[in-house]
Amino acid sequence: MKLSLLTVAAAAGAAVAAPAAEIDTRAGSVQGFDISGYQPNVDFRAAYNGGARFVMIKATEGTTFKSSTFNSQYTGATNNKFIRGGYHFAHPDTSATAQCDYFLANGGGWSNDGITLPGMIDLEGTSGKPKCYGLSASAMIAWIKAFSDRYNAKTGRYPMIYTSPDWWQSCTGNTKTFGTTIPLVLARWASSPGTPPGGWPYHTFWQNADTYRFGGDSEIFNGGMDQLQRFAKGG
């Protein structure tokens, strides 16, 4: 989740209570990974046999881009017993609700089948856009809230937020607005997750490296397999 596909293409051409599954006492961990169109041919069987149990797959970006590999990746993950979900690369300089609706229409939904993760908003900078997409901290917070509330209204779950401590500090002023309602996917490529930003008491997932042996980025769930299954089911 380092560069958007749109960025690369452009460069080449020129409040509700936290769900019950959000458990405060974490035990163990589960390996997973995230992928996008840069990894079109993942060997999901090998990844599962290698110990991975969940995967996050890029579905959409903005309101015009849908990953051409999403459907095959999602099917491959499903057929190989993964808990899986879609993520949306956010462009907070355009409508939050329009982006949420586009995400939901193109793979970002959630159901309580026990194998579907709630959708994830990928919040990070990208080339060709000003810092924080030109938004003030208050405007960025309002954008995230509008997207999250829309997702919750449509699915009954809040989406996850993927972000780094630096981005969160710079673009939201380290707001604590979402710390008790929205699961955190912490981007920190280090030997330990450290202290979560904002008001989060803990991370739910940790992107601990920008490489993974079966493709994409390494992700670790902050809990055991039973907790991951309950989290996916939403209760």
Curated annotation (Swiss-Prot):
The active site is at 34, 122, 124. One of its GO terms (biological process) is cell wall macromolecule catabolic process. It catalyses: Hydrolysis of (1->4)-beta-linkages between N-acetylmuramic acid and N-acetyl-D-glucosamine residues in a peptidoglycan and between N-acetyl-D-glucosamine residues in chitodextrins. Residues 29-235 form the Ch-type lysozyme domain. It is an enzyme of class 3 (hydrolase). One of its GO terms (molecular function) is lysozyme activity. GO terms for cellular component: extracellular region. Belongs to the glycosyl hydrolase 25 family. This enzyme has both lysozyme (acetylmuramidase) and diacetylmuramidase activities. This is N,O-diacetylmuramidase.
